[in-house]
Amino acid sequence: MFGGELDDAFGVFEGKVPKSLKEESKNSQNSQNSQKIKRTLTDKNASNQEQGTKKLESSVGEQESATKRAKIENLKDNQDLIPNNDVNGIHINNSAVADTKHKPKIGDIAADDISNEVSIKNEGDTIPEATVADSFEQEASLQVAGKVGMTEAKSSTEEVVELRHQVRHQVSIPPNYDYVPISKHKSPIPPARTYPFTLDPFQAVSIACIERQESVLVSAHTSAGKTVVAEYAVAQSLRDKQRVIYTSPIKALSNQKYRELLAEFGDVGLMTGDVTINPDATCLVMTTEILRSMLYRGSEVMREVAWVIFDEIHYMRDKERGVVWEETIILLPDKSHFVFLSATIPNAMQFAEWITKIHRQPCHVVYTDFRPTPLQHYLFPSGSDGIHLVVDEKSNFREENFQRAMSALMEKQGDDPAAMATKGNAKKGKTGKGGVKGPSDIYKIVKMIMVKNYNPVIVFSFSKRECEALALQMSKLDMNDQTERDLVTTIFNNAVNQLSEKDRELPQIEHILPLLRRGIGIHHSGLLPILKEVIEILFQEGLLKVLFATETFSIGLNMPAKTVVFTNVRKFDGKTFRWISGGEYIQMSGRAGRRGLDDRGIVILMIDEKMDPPVAKSMLKGEADRLDSAFHLSYNMILNLLRVEGISPEFMLERCFFQFQNSLEVPKLEAKLEESQQHYDSFTILDERPLEEYHTLKTQLERYRTDVRTVVNHPNFCLSFLQGGRLVRVKVGNEDFDWGVVVNVSKRPLPKGQSNEYLPQESYIVHTLVMVASDTGPLRIRSGHLPEVHPPAAEDKGKFEVVPFLLSSLDGIAHIRVFLPNDLKSQGQKLTVGKALSEVKRRFPEGITLLDPVENMNIKEPTFIKLMKKVNILESRLLSNPLHNFSELEEKYAEYLRKLALLEEVKDLKKKLSKARSIMQLDELNSRKRVLRRLGFTTSDDVIEVKGRVACEISSGDGLLLTELIFNGMFNDLTPEQCAALLSCLVFQEKSEVENQRMKEELAGPLKILQEMARRIAKVSKESKQELNEEEYVNSFKPSLMEVVYAWAHGASFAQICKMTDVYEGSLIRMFRRLEELIRQMVDAAKVIGNTSLQQKMEDTIACIHRDIVFSASLYL
């Protein structure tokens, strides 16, 4: 059936695609190696992949040298065909990487599988580069009715709106590969799988790649239909009696995917660590961590795998777990082929190049910006009664509507937006000027959605507690009829009946059912897993009309809604409150619109602060996040690579995506360096020496003044002078706010969960009346984070506002105070104080007198007095410098600074270029190896010792620390209950505000030994030049749940342990399951050294925690 569809898909392009492509051999620089390093490599079938050099048909021109990015010379017609403006042509970097013909030996592979040795290419050797070919683009269209959206006006004047989208294809080809353009592909008859619907063009192209036994990356929006491609790969493998592995980033997604594939194909197994079902099945669903473990252990299963499907491959950029994807992809054999399913990523072709480089096989990229259900994006200004369409289904940004929304927001904020400064999100329960009580914003939005029949709706919030609070606000609404309520109760009771009677009485279970019966759900990581699954099932069945969820709901799970609402446009990322990125918005808003059910998806953003049009456009129409490597070394990785024959940690570093991406920067950096160097060399300044001396003097003075400012702004010295009406000079970074008037001073609140105190100069907030840019919006303090505000530009008249600044922003405290009225809410009162400030500045044209730090502020420390003397001396030197009164000083000095900036740029580029040419993270690898040698995990020749083999078994916790504790006899005298409690320190990562005040002695003792051992490891690490903060390392082992785990292991009920901590129930269960996984690894570690007593103790430890709701089975299984 695919033959006809492919003819339709490719027929238009037959005249465009084939042009002759010439290949050139390039010189490769091998970054660190001056001699040939021989490696024993495996996979005897790889030699069959060698083919003679042939001309490849392609739509690209000649490829240039390896030191320059490949260009496409003959793509005038097709230049726009590269997905998302990827650079024309593709360059596979050869720096420091072995161009081997075979895969390294993984695990204990039979001797007859070991092939001949191949050496890494040295400088001067030639390695043919991979090329990119078969680039084409197809435009498809979708028609939707031009009907009324959520506003009263039509989104389009047309009766029918035609929406166009592109399907783009490229392929990265290894050298000497006999490639046939995909337009000439003919599908087999019959195909491996047929569908009762017409395939979308991107699906047909992707399936054609699979039929050709060639890897493919499918990059498309959520709900576009990528699963169809994965299912075809499974069906083809089952037909050909070949093993296929389906990997996903999270266990919940693996469970759900297992259920779907089992229903579709039958011969399906599951391996997640927690559960193993039918491990001999032809199709195995597993987490990526399990696949990596199988590769390191040389599992027999891997010898039979023809296809590996990586779902949600964009998860590879995750800082913590993304490295697992890279390890796995590198370790997989070359004979396996891959299907990568991804959200839209702008550098998809770069990823395909990397796959071609490390596995010497073609990798196609099929990219589409197709949305089966187009989206309309609305803004809801806080406190208003209407929404504004700002981006229509054709992706047009409606500037006029955006400005209306901003005007409505400013009007509703009242005359004093800063009055809301410390109230955070309290306004969500208010509307109108002055904060008159009324229905909350979310209540109004949900009610409007229900009235207009735009449910089901997912309401995204970035806080678990806010999810629950907003859901409770909806409890007056009843969105289900009696039949639906009864059905919800039946499904819910059937699910929780597997729990014990005590567990069914947990508050979370009892309190959520009334909400579910009303059609209101909650979904976040703090929920009990069984409740999350029940809610997912109810939502899929249409029994929940409103779902309040955190961002994690947007990952993987295929549960679209008709409408998506964002309660905030800012999120806390662990450091600051920032705008949602374009990639995050795309991922979450992609849940709007159900294919086949809705002709449009609706997205509503609740906004509570002014947003500039560029910010809104970058969020609503921005590019998806790039797929950038998050590769980092770990001791477990290094030890496993040292243990396995034929590969090494250097092997991993040379082939990782991180190294590949950095190497691609070399040509750009070289070009930029050459340009900057030429610019610097041609930059001449007459009589430069005096300017250099003047600059040195001024820089030194500025440094001393900064030191003075740090002392003066210490709360102990300045707080008593910061009364209301005091004049202060404010400077934030390079932005000068000039003089302002102190309104009041308040203690800066710590963000929730942050235990580290601020620096003294950052621990207080000075609310100051200053002149700011005219377009400044509401100024709120969010969990201790100050709003972004700017002084008026030269052409801007500006306006007076009360702005929160840190003490560190004060650049001077004046002698003078002005009268301050009791109330500064109105703009008129602010203007009155502003006029008084202007009058003071007029009366002191030479400058307002500052408080003297020594005489007035009484700072008498000898070191400070010395510092002040240095400042005075340097100031007098600067004033007596011949250039000080030079009429052209400002112009000449600015010119000198430009030259200095150029010099810094050249130095910086040289450093970056040197770094890009070398093997990344090699210094860190060497320092980690020194640590392993000093602790006795490896020999001086990097041969793994017994300690190292034990540590190889432990991947769910700190392998070094646990191995040291095992060999130290730490667990010999502990009971199983104590073992469980102590090991919880290594798996609990969340923050808890309830710390153990008085820990039981039987727990405090082992904890102290663990911390002492951690300090020893930290000391050895620092001595080995490993960057490690000792206190941070020791504090990373959190004892917050030791008492909780100890009580559970002694038989306490789940309800009892929940009362002992503020940690969410779902987080507790997740911790217990990770703990069990770690203890199982401890059992394996004990087996390695033949310690049967430790093995038995760890098995007893599992027995005392493995019970009840903590380990209840998934509803998907």
Curated annotation (Swiss-Prot):
Residues 19-86, 414-433 are annotated as: Disordered. Signal peptide: none annotated. Residues 207-363 form the Helicase ATP-binding domain. GO terms for cellular component: nucleolus; nucleus; TRAMP complex. InterPro entries: DEAD/DEAH_box_helicase_dom (IPR011545), Helicase_ATP-bd (IPR014001), Helicase_C-like (IPR001650), MTR4-like_stalk (IPR048392), MTR4_beta-barrel (IPR025696), P-loop_NTPase (IPR027417), RNA-DNA_Helicase (IPR050699), SKI2-like (IPR016438). ATP binds at residues 220-227. It is found in: Nucleus. Its main location: nucleus. GO terms for molecular function: ATP binding; ATP hydrolysis activity; RNA binding; RNA helicase activity. Keywords: ATP-binding, Helicase, Hydrolase, Nucleotide-binding, Nucleus, rRNA processing. It comes from the Eukaryota. It is an enzyme of class 3 (hydrolase). GO terms for biological process: maturation of 5.8S rRNA; polyadenylation-dependent ncRNA catabolic process; RNA catabolic process; siRNA catabolic process; TRAMP-dependent tRNA surveillance pathway. A motif (DEIH box) lies at residues 311-314. Residues 441-642 form the Helicase C-terminal domain. Its EC number is 3.6.4.-. Residues 65-79 have a biased composition (Basic and acidic residues). PROSITE patterns: HELICASE_ATP_BIND_1 (PS51192), HELICASE_CTER (PS51194). Belongs to the helicase family. SKI2 subfamily. Component of the TRAMP complex which has a poly(A) RNA polymerase activity and is involved in a post-transcriptional quality control mechanism limiting inappropriate expression of genetic information. Polyadenylation is required for the degradative activity of the exosome on several of its nuclear RNA substrates. Required for heterochromatic gene silencing at centromeric repeats by either exosome- or RNAi-mediated degradation of heterochromatic transcripts. Component of the TRAMP complex composed of at least cid14, mtr4, and air1. This is ATP-dependent RNA helicase mtr4. It comes from Schizosaccharomyces pombe (strain 972 / ATCC 24843).
